[in-house]
Amino acid sequence: MSDPEQFIRGIILNLEDTSENFLLLSIFCPNGLHRCLIRKLRKLTSLSSPDLFDEVEITFQSSMNQGLPFVKEYQVIKKRITIAKDRACFDGACFLARFYLHNGEHLLESAKFFQILHKAFHSFSEHHHPPTILLKSLFLFSQAEGLPVKESWLFGLSKESANIAHYVLFKPLKDSVILSEKVPPLLESLSKWLRAETELRC
């Protein structure tokens, strides 16, 4: 009896060189974080090789002996090469990818978290302000986890900072450009709160 096949569609958060022949892919999709092995391409092919932050559809063969599954077929649905053209956006995308790798293993209702990630990577691709993207993403992630981020962190800010944060968090990215320079201290404040008050690794 052959091993069962599974199909996923998600975003590549990490590629790790594990051997001469295989790469380890870490992919976050609507049903959570998945890891699988893909054979390295050794010859020219019309098939686009999956890369960091790409959105992919993958069919993989699950291993009956509890080992990592192997990719049987894949298709790159959306490449995000524009992220790498802006260093700040690339660094921001890497930060969010690490955050999901550290905290995305046992999430309930993973589809909500995938939507947050998907929207963030679209924004990075469009070269919006990285600290603002991260602030909104971490805030939404915390809310989706059921953490009191609004009641504890947001309401604990000074009146001026709270007003700025509220505007940035609840307005479209394009409308908060004028406040971009005010965002990094808020992002640092939220990151500190997450490290001190929650079990999330940030």
Regions found by a protein language model. Give the residues of each.
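Non-catalytic alpha-helical scaffolds and adjoining flexible linkers that form interface surfaces
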Residues: 1-23, 28-202
